[in-house]
Amino acid sequence: MMSALSQAAKSLLLQDFVSAFFLSMRQFFAPKETINYPHEKGPVSPRFRGEHALRRYPNGEERCIACKLCEAICPAQAITIEAGPRRNDGTRRTVRYDIDMVKCIYCGFCQEACPVDAIVEGPNFEFATETREELYYDKDKLLANGDRWERELARNISLDAPYR
């Protein structure tokens, strides 16, 4: 009898409706969690894996030593490297360094395998194109990406260094 009486009082006073209404009002006036994307950008983690880039040393020489570890470890087989002849000092550089971004799965294995931090995945995630051919990155495009993002790439690598 008591439970029926309390149930009737609860429905008569619209307790569920009122509590739901106050919950809605609290959420309505709370700060918004979304951002207006094209005009505002959220924070990007230093470990974010975006558009690929080839880095240079401070003297302007490219870092890649044509060891081909990134090509060997790539599970999608998206990287193609051609090594040039050995130089007088015994080192090699690449003649051709291509990445097919359509095949790439952005796993980051190439970046982890590189002994000289030459190939990195940068902070850029806005690289949509109209044709598939534009997603075939050659060495010049990768070096241009590295030059454009070098300051942020160096900062991200230094922030990630304690965890490597």
UniProtKB/Swiss-Prot annotation:
Coiled-coil residue spans: none
GO BP, sorted A to Z: aerobic respiration
Gene3D superfamilies: 3.30.70.3270
Residue stretches making up the 4Fe-4S ferredoxin-type domain: 54-84, 95-124
Top-rank taxon, per record: Bacteria
Protein keywords: 4Fe-4S, Cell inner membrane, Cell membrane, Iron, Iron-sulfur, Membrane, Metal-binding, NAD, Quinone, Repeat, Translocase, Ubiquinone
Amino-acid positions noted as binding [4Fe-4S] cluster 1 in the UniProt annotation, renumbered to this chain: C64, C67, C70, C114
The enzyme's E.C. designation: 7.1.1.-
Residues that coordinate or bind [4Fe-4S] cluster 2: C74, C104, C107, C110
Segment forming the signal sequence: none
Membrane topology: Peripheral membrane protein
Main location: membrane
Pfam families with a match to the protein in the record: Fer4_7 (PF12838)
Record GO terms (molecular function): 4 iron, 4 sulfur cluster binding; iron ion binding; NADH:ubiquinone reductase (non-electrogenic) activity; quinone binding
Record InterPro entries: 4Fe4S_Fe-S-bd, 4Fe4S_Fe_S_CS, NADH_quinone_OxRdtase_chainI
Cofactor note: Binds 2 [4Fe-4S] clusters per subunit.
Listed GO CC annotations: plasma membrane
Cofactor(s) this protein requires: [4Fe-4S] cluster
PROSITE patterns referenced in this protein's UniProt entry, alphabetically: 4FE4S_FER_1, 4FE4S_FER_2
Catalyzed reaction equations: a quinone + NADH + 5 H(+)(in) = a quinol + NAD(+) + 4 H(+)(out)
Cell compartment(s), UniProt: Cell inner membrane
Complex formation: NDH-1 is composed of 14 different subunits. Subunits NuoA, H, J, K, L, M, N constitute the membrane sector of the complex.
Function: NDH-1 shuttles electrons from NADH, via FMN and iron-sulfur (Fe-S) centers, to quinones in the respiratory chain. The immediate electron acceptor for the enzyme in this species is believed to be ubiquinone. Couples the redox reaction to proton translocation (for every two electrons transferred, four hydrogen ions are translocated across the cytoplasmic membrane), and thus conserves the redox energy in a proton gradient.
Family in the record: Belongs to the complex I 23 kDa subunit family.
The name this protein goes by in its record: NADH-quinone oxidoreductase subunit I
Protein source organism: Mesorhizobium japonicum (strain LMG 29417 / CECT 9101 / MAFF 303099) (Mesorhizobium loti (strain MAFF 303099))
Classification of source organism: Bacteria, Pseudomonadati, Pseudomonadota, Alphaproteobacteria, Hyphomicrobiales
Gene field: nuoI
